[in-house]
Amino acid sequence: MLQILAESAEGLAQKVMAAAGFKVKASDRAGADKGSLATDYLIFIANNEIDKLADLAIAAFDEGEDVSKMKKEVSAIFHGPQAVDIALFGRMLADAPDLNTDASAQVAHAFSIDQITPEYDYFTAVDDCASEDNAGAAMIDTVGFNSSTLYRYATVNIDALRDQLQDDSATVEGVVAFVEAFVKSMPSGKQNTFANHTLPEDVVVTLRESQPISAADAFEDPVRRKDGISVSRQGVERLGERQNDIRENYGEEPVKAWYVATGGAVSSLNEWCEQVSLPDLEQSLKETLNAAYSA
């Protein structure tokens, strides 16, 4: 029986995809994948969804039923508890829009708060094995780069995340993990060339009941260098001042707020934020969310 099931596995997988509304055809990609079955586009499916879809296909096979007709059962699996990455960043399926998952996280493009001065890394490479009458560089090129101070912003709709994960503990752990990843992660492109392994000068985390609020407009006027005061430090102070303006003029008082600052206390943040280390911030955030769910 297991041998027969193994031989039918690919066909069953194809029928499951058909029940979900996805078209499967022979791949025209070059290499070893050419001719193998593939969907028209990439589909983000969580491991727990794969397991449940496989169980459904096996049960249908054992009962002699056609899993390709089990559209309701397949849809229920896609609408069940989501994996944290899908719950955070969403999933769009053009052929099956009813299976789409709205993202509970939003991540803004980082932008420079100061004036950028492009610089260029000029490099040459010489062929050590070239003949004596073939002098000169084998390669000459430049790589553009800049060293800017960035403002980064992201927000998570915790209620929406809880609805998709359907688990209080997973929601709390997911939010805390997202905060740490957002703070510490850096783009990996060109890291060997520029070693851009930096951590933020300042991190502000707020819990709000009303709406997410970005302070991007604090830097509409670029930060300019001053003697003895770094751009990043000026940016931190301006960020706090803008948040204070929002609190005073819009009445947007956060439920809880923390900040991490490597350059010492920030006067404009001390009025409404608790200064902590990142580990303490994560622990306090975790305790606050757990208390909210247990209330």
Each PLM stretch: what is its role?
Residues 1-295:
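Basic polyanion-binding and macromolecular-assembly surfaces
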